[in-house]
């Protein structure tokens, strides 16, 4: 198989399939979620929301200034059905999601911040207070203000209220700022993932877009076997 080395994670994941598959609900909220307004998402909805998220990051209305390529958003949350939406949105804007364990203690969180220098944190309702305290502490080191957003539709710092919905409106009005972002899939980071820190503090692992696209194809083939229609067909 010839791997698509020209693909970024967003371009690969968000490619249009068919009307039937595009509108099928694929991301389902947990039955145990405490988010009252959480709803299942189709690929079309993931695409629209991710582009809204990324567009908002690059807008003049975002806190401080528009995001630049390579800037980092720390994800400090337990699993969420729309985790992928936010991660793709950050990548569309040229940013890098830094994926942190919601079990991190303050010293581990601060260490992760020192390694990746995040501009913003995306937390859950459960981790919000810890994220807010960590952001304040990190800002006091001279790192600048660290914005905090939340995976919740009703929270005062909701990523929907502050990023996705405003970004959708900008996109609908003709904002094409995301089309100016240039990413080299083989050299530019898609994610920072952290090791368990078994020996010492957690360590950041840099994964490129090509790394992630290749792994996605490998897992699709492994899990799908010869039963399902291939998701990727070069």
Would you name each region that the model predicts?
Residues 24-26, 156, 168-194, 201, ...:
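Conserved pre-ATP/AMP-binding loop-to-beta segment of ANL
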Residues 46-55, 205-234:
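Conserved structural elements of the adenylate-forming
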Residues 77-88, 103-107, 234:
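Conserved coil-to-alpha-helix start sites within the AMP-binding
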Residues 73, 90, 121, 189, ...:
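Conserved S/T- and glycine-rich ATP-binding loop of Class I adenylate-forming
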Residues 92, 96-173, 179:
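Structural core segment of the AMP-binding/adenylate-forming
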Residues 40-43, 182, 190-217:
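Conserved AMP-binding A3 loop
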Residues 45, 78-79, 104, 125-127, ...:
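Short beta->alpha linker loops
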Residues 1-72, 88, 93, 114:
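N-lobe entry segment of adenylate-forming
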């Amino acid at each position: 198989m010839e791997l698509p080395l020209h693909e970024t994670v967003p371009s690969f994941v968000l490619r249009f399939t068919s009307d039937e598959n595009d509108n099928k609900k694929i991301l389902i909220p947990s039955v145990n979620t405490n988010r009252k307004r959480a709803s299942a998402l189709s690929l079309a909805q993931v695409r629209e929301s991710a582009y809204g998220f990324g567009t908002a990051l690059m807008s003049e209305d975002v806190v401080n200034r528009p995001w630049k390529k390579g800037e980092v958003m720390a994800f400090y949350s337990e699993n969420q059905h729309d985790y992928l939406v936010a991660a793709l949105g950050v990548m569309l804007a040229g940013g890098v999601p830094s994926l942190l364990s919601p079990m991190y203690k303050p010293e581990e969180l601060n260490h992760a911040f020192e390694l990746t220098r995040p501009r913003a944190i995306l937390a859950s309702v459960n981790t919000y207070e810890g994220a807010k305290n960590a952001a304040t502490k990190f800002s006091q080191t001279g790192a600048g203000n660290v914005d905090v957003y939340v995976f919740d539709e009703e929270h005062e710092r909701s990523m929907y209220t502050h990023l996705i919905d405003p970004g959708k409106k900008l996109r609908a009005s003709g904002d094409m700022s995301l089309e100016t972002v240039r990413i080299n899939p083989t050299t530019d980071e898609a994610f920072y993932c952290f090791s368990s820190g078994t020996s010492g503090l957690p360590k950041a692992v840099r994964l490129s877009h090509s790394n992630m696209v290749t792994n996605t194809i490998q897992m699709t083939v492994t899990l799908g076997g010869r039963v399902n229609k291939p998701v990727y067909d070069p």
